[in-house]
Amino acid sequence: MRADLDAFLEHLRSERQVSAHTLDGYRRDLLKILALAEKAGLSDWNALDTRSLRTFVARLHQQGQSSRSLARLLSATRGLYQYLLREGRCRHDPANGLSAPKSPRKLPRTLDADRALQLLDGAVEDDFIARRDQALLELFYSSGLRLSELVGLDLEWLDLKEGLVRVRGKGNKVRELPVGKAARQALEAWLPLRTQAAPEDGAVFIGRSGKRLTPRAIQLRVRQAGVRELGQHLHPHMLRHSFASHLLESSGDLRAVQELLGHADIATTQIYTHLDFQHLASVYDRAHPRAKRKGNADGGNDP
């Protein structure tokens, strides 16, 4: 088996001319499979079937290998077997159709409601930068905008009288969103100052030069506000996640949250139900008299 593996690696080096880094990756991954196969008493690559390979992958996953690493390992294994099939050294590919175990989806980070209010309720100086930053923070949290949507927002899409904003989201889809009272007030305080910069176009959020703020500039302003008010780094999407989580927590209306976020598939929105459950579980742990009851199920030493 080792001779076949070495021949494949030489094929990658001399004929495919892969980089040394890529070649080392193939070697490490395939040596893991070889070690497991030899430990199982297999004497050639034909003896490795899909069931055995799945068992090997599961074992590596239990040992702490990430899904990404295992996907790369399976890709290397498929490459080996395709080579062996072409060379007539093997009759099947046990990795065909096999996929790596999926990692649990990471929950988005959010602020709890009190922290969100702490961020937004700080004292605001009456100057260009402070008023602008307050308006964009309020709008992020009030309407759940994506960073790209806030960057691309023009005055003509803002209706403060009706408390509405239109944005162009993913897939060039336009949606209309409510603007809360606090966000309206922040925008009303910002827009008169905006004209001082002689804006080049209709962008709602601009710098002192009059140019539309870039995504990077907005990320920096949000991060600085987080450090100043909360002592932590924030990202614009964290405010969007907080908007969704708090709205779902209060309303329980998943479909409405989906529409407001502009998600094409409700499955994307369902991640926030896990956040909501975490909140409910936390409330239960803090408030229920028997939530943290000590002792075993049979009552310990009770008669």
UniProtKB/Swiss-Prot annotation:
Residues 1-85 form the Core-binding (CB) domain. Its main location: cytoplasm. GO terms for cellular component: cytoplasm; Holliday junction resolvase complex. The active site is at R146, K170, H237, R240, H263, Y272 (o-(3'-phospho-dna)-tyrosine intermediate). One of its GO terms (biological process) is DNA transposition. HAMAP family: Recomb_XerC_XerD. This is Tyrosine recombinase XerC. It comes from Pseudomonas aeruginosa (strain ATCC 15692 / DSM 22644 / CIP 104116 / JCM 14847 / LMG 12228 / 1C / PRS 101 / PAO1). The gene is xerC.
